[in-house]
């Protein structure tokens, strides 16, 4: 499940959990964990209870969670004194603003992809809003702010999210790219997965 992936080490090419000599999962070397509107240790149970309360996410085909990643520039740790603890605090405050009313796991790793060392934060939210909130600027459907409404990862929402990340980085004096401009070179999902598994070409 989501919590196991975020807490324990996994082989990046196979996705399988890495075990020690006693066949126990290896905890990640450094991580920071918080829960938003939930206890992180019981995130899955609390999400299930929320879904049942609102009679949502009962079919296998329904989207039950959304996973977002905030990836900080590797130079931030060297030049800007960014630590895993500081990134966790920043990301938690951002999550409170971006995902009000949702149950969420906020987990920061300091290892990066393939040991690159870039600090990054995972935000995993239950797709069903637990509590009603004030209507937000990106909401374009009626009643989108009410409890029980399912999260919609629309372009309007994503642009709002990206701008908030950029503003946070500027405010904190961190390196950041223009997330709202199209990338010069696009990488397909197949190319990304090939790179992740260590292949140079498809």
Predicted feature residues:
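N-terminal nicking endonuclease/strand-transfer module with a His-rich metal-binding environment
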Residues: 1-202
